[in-house]
Structures are given as C-alpha cells and as structure tokens.
Regions:
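Short, electropositive alpha-helical surface patch
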Residues: 158-177, 263-277, 389-401
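Short, acidic/polar
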Residues: 86-102, 129, 180-190, 264-276, ...
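Aromatic-rich peripheral "rim/lid" segments of glycoside hydrolase catalytic domains that contact
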Residues: 61-69, 118, 161-162, 190-194, ...
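Substrate-binding cleft and catalytic face of glycoside hydrolase catalytic domains
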Residues: 71, 101-119, 127-254, 258-260, ...
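Boundary/entry segment of secreted carbohydrate-active catalytic domains
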Residues: 58-105, 109
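Secretory targeting and sorting signals
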Residues: 2-56
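Substrate-binding cleft/loops of secretory-pathway carbohydrate-active enzymes
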Residues: 259-284, 304, 331, 384-387
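Acidic-and-aromatic substrate-binding clefts and catalytic sites of carbohydrate-active enzymes
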Residues: 84-96, 114-127, 212-216, 220, ...
Length: 416
C-alpha cells in the first residue's frame, strides 16, 4: 500500500521538522505531500485509475470502512495475525464493524486481567471475556489472551493472608502458588466448558507482562520489585509458564515487555528468557509491546527481533501493543511515565503527519522482518479508543493509531 510521493517542490508548505534522531534520518516531507499521497492511495483503494487519481480522489477524509483491510495489506507481507486490542464495549456498533473489517486477531485490553476475572477470591466473572470470545467466534478471529499475571491489575487480596502481606516464607510461597494455579485453572476450565471440542479461538497468551525494570535495581535481570517477585523471586515467572502450559497445552505462550528498543533493557529481557529456556521453562514466544514515540529508533526494534532469533530461532515473535505517541515523554523514549507532558506539535495536522512518517518506517521494517514475526497487534481500534487519551494518561493530542477519532484513515494508515 505504500505510495509516498517524492519531496514536494518548494512551493508546497512543509511541516515543522521532527527533532533530529540521527544524521541518517530522512528529511520529513511536507503535510501537503502527505495529503497528496493519501489522495492517490484513496483513489487506488476505491478503484480509480492511477492516471486520474488526483482528479477523482475525494478531498475529505476517507472512512476506514472504505479502504483496504490492514489484515490483507500486512497479510500479503507475510504477517499471519494482524490484531487489535479491544474491550467488551466494542463488540457492537461502528467499532465492531471497523475491527471486523481490518483485523483477524484481537487482544482483550483489560477483560483477561486478574482484577476483571477474579476481583474477589473464589468469585469469578467471565462476562467480559465471554463477549470477546463470542465476537472472535462470530468473525473468524483469533484471540491473543492478555494477561493472567500482571501486578498492576492483580487485586490486592492475591498478596495478602488475613490482611497480612505475604512474605517469602515457605508457607506464603505455597499460598501464592496455590492462588496462581486456582486462577489459571478457573480460566482454562471456563474456556473448556465453552469449547468442549478444543476449538477455542485462543491461539496465544501473554503469560506475564512487564516484569523488567527500566534500570539497574540489584535484582536478577533487574526484575521489578513486585509482590510476585518478593514472594517467589524470579521463580514466579517459571511458575506462571508451567501453569499456563499445564492448563493451556495447545496455546502459544509469550512473555511480554515494553521499552525493548532500549539496549540495556533488551539485555535484561533476553537474559531472563535465556535463563528460563535453560531451566526448560515452556516459553514459546517473545513479544515487544512497541509503545513508541516520534524519536524512537526503529532499528533498535529490529535489533531486538534479531537478538531473539539469535538466542533461539524457534522462539515465536510478536509486536504486541503497537502505537506511536507524540508527547515530549514519548519523544525521549519513556513509554511508561507519560503523565504531565506536552505535545511535540501544537498543530494536530503536524502531529498526524509526523506519526504517519514513523509508521512508514515501522511498516517498512515489519515487511522486511515478516519472516520473524508471527503477529502484529495495534493497541486500540482507533484514536478515540487509545489508552493515551484515558484520564490516567491524559494526552488528548496523541494520534497513535491508523484510524482517527471518527474512524477515518489517518496518515498512519496510508503509510502501510
């Protein structure tokens, strides 16, 4: 789908240049040029002959329902699973239509997390995940389950015994392991009850999520000092994967992490994976979240893909939470602490264009690395659904996804 025009003539208005990433970074063309590219691509998408594209293409934004499906565009490049994070509130209406058209896989954004499924010990609520399973069934989609064990959305009771925080005593370790097993077993039993023939749409699972800290902290592999770690140490990851394999033997088991384009974090991440494999822990896939920013170095994402392949060519790989932020924090590569930031560009059109050019680099890399990637998942169906607009993050200027707040095709889409 890539059809980006050559540099416009001087008479074409150009956008403010992006902050320099390095000397090799290509100069950014003007916004008018990107709009021209969108017009030409629109004409192609709706079947207008190339020679008449400029005359026939509409001047207004093109609805996402009228353009080529991303699952076909990236599928033609060799990506089998083209996914989207979605919530149970999106199973009907225009969001459902857009998702069904463009994606062949989906990730539950929150419905698979422990606080949604087991908010109180022994009381399970599968209503949200069931809606998503039904949606996947109805539209022939696969589910990438996310995520049984992640501290920020694991309820507090998981780590307490009669109000007392669990320690690393043998008794407390046994209690936490028992709770981990009860949780995984309940999910597996519920899925099995819905799919007694074993034909569940769940093809993969993020077993653990974000276990590596952003800098040295003295723990093995700089693992985060969470209650999971304080009670079980590094072995909590072993326990999680062994339980997942026991109860979901046919599902591909992934470990998921953010900021994997950082060389130091890459070293910690792959060091942990290497040790897990040496202990014969059933890690089958390695994911890069890829919440990136305007100055992120796409080559560092590629370097991590190559490093995983060098570690073990049998490991599956996924880009699991793709979006492109345009805040000052995102521009410095910090994908976790984005609160109280400001936009890089004050003009929304400039933001959209800059994000589009990052996606162009991303899609080029994804095509080149398609043989190493099992899955690419966008973290939201459109810009009205992005986590970056949530009250806890509060960055309304961000336009991180291929489709806009009205589900129109954005420059990020045309870059595909």
């Amino acid at each position: 789908m890539t059809l980006i025009p050559r540099r416009p003539r001087a008479s074409v208005r150009t956008a403010p240049s992006l902050p320099d990433r390095d000397a090799r970074r290509r100069p950014r063309r003007g916004l008018a040029a990107l709009a021209s590219a969108a017009a030409v691509l629109t004409a192609v998408a709706i079947g207008v002959p190339a020679g008449s594209a400029s005359a026939a293409a509409p001047s207004t934004p093109v609805p996402g329902m009228q353009v080529s499906a991303l699952k076909d565009v990236l599928g033609d490049a060799g990506i089998e699973h083209v996914g989207v994070a979605m919530g149970s509130g999106e199973v009907q209406g225009t969001s459902a239509d857009l998702i069904a058209r463009h994606f062949n896989a989906m990730t539950p954004e929150n419905e698979g997390k422990a606080d949604a499924i087991q908010p109180v010990e022994g009381r399970f609520d599968f209503s949200g995940i069931d809606k998503l399973l039904d949606f996947a069934d109805a539209h022939g989609m696969k589910m990438y389950f996310h995520v049984p064990y992640w501290k920020p959305q694991t309820p507090a009771w998981f780590f307490l015994d009669n109000g007392r925080p669990l320690t690393n005593s043998p008794a407390d370790q046994a209690l936490l392991k028992a709770r981990m097993e009860a949780h995984m077993k309940a999910i597996a039993d519920h899925v099995a009850s819905r799919y007694p023939k074993g034909n569940s749409p769940i093809w993969a699972m993020d077993v653990v999520n974000e276990v590596i800290d952003d800098g040295p902290n003295g723990n093995p592999h700089d693992m985060k000092d969470t209650p999971f770690f304080r009670v079980l140490g590094e072995g909590f990851v072993d326990e999680a994967f062994q339980l997942a394999k026991k109860y979901f033997p046919g599902v591909k088991l992934f470990i998921n992490e953010y900021n994997t384009d950082s060389p130091s974090k890459r070293a910690d991440y792959l060091g942990l994976v290497s040790d897990l494999l040496k202990r014969h822990i059933p890690v089958e896939g390695v994911s890069q979240q890829s919440h990136i920013g305007l100055r992120s170095d796409i080559e560092e994402l590629r370097n991590t893909i190559h490093a995983v392949k060098a570690l073990d060519p049998n490991l599956l790989q996924a880009i699991s939470e793709l979006d492109v932020g345009a805040s000052q924090a995102a521009a410095t590569g910090n994908s976790e602490n984005r609160n109280h930031t400001a936009p890089i560009y004050s003009n929304p059109d400039d933001t959209a264009a800059a994000v589009g050019w990052v996606y162009k680099d991303l899609f080029t890399m994804i095509r080149q690395e398609a043989g190493n990637l099992e899955s690419v998942t966008f973290w939201g169906s459109d810009n009205s659904r992005t986590w970056l607009h949530s009250p806890s993050i509060d960055q309304p200027w961000d336009q991180p996804l291929p489709f806009g707040t009205h589900q129109e095709a954005m420059p990020a889409y045309w870059a595909s």
